[in-house]
From Swiss-Prot:
Zinc finger (CR-type): 139-217
Compartment(s) of residence: Cytoplasm
Protein name per its UniProtKB record: Chaperone protein DnaJ
Lineage, highest ranks first: Bacteria, Pseudomonadati, Pseudomonadota, Alphaproteobacteria, Hyphomicrobiales
NCBIfam families the record matches: DnaJ_bact, PRK10767.1
One GO BP annotation of this record: chaperone cofactor-dependent protein refolding
Amino acid sequence: MSKRDYYEVLGVAKTASESELKVAFRKLAMVHHPDRNPGDKEAEIKFKEVNEAYQCLSDGEKRAAYDRFGHAAFSQGGAGGPGFGNEFGDFMSDIFENFFGDGRGAPGGGRGRGGAPGRERGADLRYNLEISLEEAFSGKTETIRIPTSIACEACSGTGAKAGSKPRTCSTCGGYGRVRAAQGFFAIERTCPNCHGRGEVVDDPCTACSGAGRVNRERTLSINVPAGVDDGLRIRLAGEGESGLRGGPSGDLYVFLSIKPHPFFQRDGADLFCRVPISMVTAALSGEITVPVIDGSQTQVRIPAGTQTAKQFRIKGKGMPVLRSREVGDLYIQVSVETPQNLTKRQRELLQEFDQSASDENHPESAGFFSKVRDFFVSGATRA
């Protein structure tokens, strides 16, 4: 059976650079790897084909021979077929270690080739903090208490009882990973005995039960700057769980949420407030007093003939912009309130007004009903 062209197998041009070959190979190897296609014979064949093509084209001398003679260069009596040495195994191990292990490579546990047991970074923590809109306006310092874990002082984070120490894992030789043969190919997996640490604790510390960490509650002060918005995340570096074996601590992420306000709605740095006004004030004009987010009050002049939903802008009375000197605006939207529970005299006065009113007093409604009449008249004419 004839072999496919190696360039065709990798899906690259004959002028492809070394980096282009490597990218194509990694992509195809991921797709056809036997561990990702268990029991799929076709995938296994394609995987071997991809490996063979890359081994040839990634070697300068073999590629030159292949470009000149094709597959005949590696037939019996030729230059020799592409091999799969230890260097290739190490290279492929680097590619697949994050896919077929448990993620204990960098920056966490495990150990490098020939190195000491790796440091393990502490876990990140999350804290949800709810504040008021006024606190978001002015900023504040909040003291919080968080449950976390710190390095055990009794064993200095090793997990071993005082006077003893962890021993090198006999299963993986302290490497933290073991190799499993997959046909002609070797795949690395996290060691099932030491779980990637490279060490085993035979006599665990009684204070932490061999975990190397103990649970504690910590008190922290969080600076909430003025102008924060709902959903903002504050990162406190190194304030998460302690690392193991000298590893760095994780981070603490504080997620802010802002309580609903009884008066104000927020849109970015701008605030909106709906204020009811009397029918008389709307008709004759007047002044109303409205609240401001800083706790003060301000006056708004209502002109005669103001309608519901009319909006008034008060510049510079909104929220501060985070890490800026800019400030948003306050928008007052009025709602004309229809009077209720009228006395006899009040009803009489309104009836007198209605009898004396003309379309000039209600231009919007007069215009609307005029359009309605025109609509029906034109409809009747067409019929």
